[in-house]
Amino acid sequence: MWQERLAQLVTTCHWIGAKGWAPATGGNMSVRQDDTWCWLSESGRDKGSLTTEDFLQVEIATNQAPSGRKPSAETGLHTLVYRLFPEANVVLHVHTVNATVLSRIEKSDTLALQGYEMQKTLSGQHSHLDTVPVAIFDNDQDIDALAARIADYAQTRPLRYGFLLRGHGLTCWGKDIQEARRQLEGLEFLFECELMRRRYEP
């Protein structure tokens, strides 16, 4: 099953690369193998031309790669998602312009999206009248410290679809490739709408 997910993830990485959502080898993607292991893209690889050989097996509990090769810098964010959400089987971390800029414009720790029909692309959302909260965390080069802050936040407030890193990008996930990809595309559309709304509304 996970082998099929990995093959689907490679196709999704090519789609992400074609969209320009992981420029200059940025971003990282992973699939869960089981409760112990995940497969994560290797550091410094162009996402538009990845193959299955560019993914490393990583232990979820320790962030260690038995192969000795270097996994992506944000490995600890992927393994955190797998520990926090047993239903998550795919994690996508992208560096889109909309996510990067909007996370800097919004000064609070939550981006509240409301009034958009496309909110319904997110799992569990049924109305444009609902408010979709997307947590924003200050960026940190110490990924262990960043992961600890996110874990503390998740103890008291829900992280349902993904989160933003300020001036950095978006991390989102899903139970399978289809859900993760839909939520990435949906959130990216909503971020673009919100940026345009803030530009044009007085």
Curated annotation (Swiss-Prot):
Cofactor binding annotation: Binds 1 zinc ion per subunit.
Swiss-Prot/TrEMBL keywords: Amino-acid biosynthesis, Lyase, Metal-binding, Methionine biosynthesis, Zinc
Single GO cellular component term: cytosol
InterPro entries hit by this protein: Aldolase_class_II_sugar_metab (IPR050197), Aldolase_II/adducin_N (IPR001303), Aldolase_II/adducin_N_sf (IPR036409), MethylthioRu-1-P_deHdtase_MtnB (IPR017714)
Involved pathway(s): Amino-acid biosynthesis; L-methionine biosynthesis via salvage pathway; L-methionine from S-methyl-5-thio-alpha-D-ribose 1-phosphate: step 2/6
Enzyme Commission code(s) on record: 4.2.1.109
Binding site for Zn(2+): 93, 95
Cofactor(s) essential for the protein: Zn(2+)
UniProt entry tagged with the keyword Amino-acid biosynthesis: yes
GO MF: aldehyde-lyase activity; methylthioribulose 1-phosphate dehydratase activity; zinc ion binding
Catalytic activity: 5-(methylsulfanyl)-D-ribulose 1-phosphate = 5-methylsulfanyl-2,3-dioxopentyl phosphate + H2O
Coiled-coil intervals, chain numbering: none
Highest taxon of source: Bacteria
EC class name: lyase
One GO BP: pentose catabolic process
One Pfam family it belongs to: Aldolase_II
Alphabetized SMART domains for the sequence: Aldolase_II
HAMAP family per the UniProt record, alphabetical: Salvage_MtnB (MF_01677)
Stated role: Catalyzes the dehydration of methylthioribulose-1-phosphate (MTRu-1-P) into 2,3-diketo-5-methylthiopentyl-1-phosphate (DK-MTP-1-P).
Family the entry assigns: Belongs to the aldolase class II family. MtnB subfamily.
Name of the featured protein: Methylthioribulose-1-phosphate dehydratase
The organism of origin for this protein: Klebsiella pneumoniae (strain 342)
Chain's gene name: mtnB
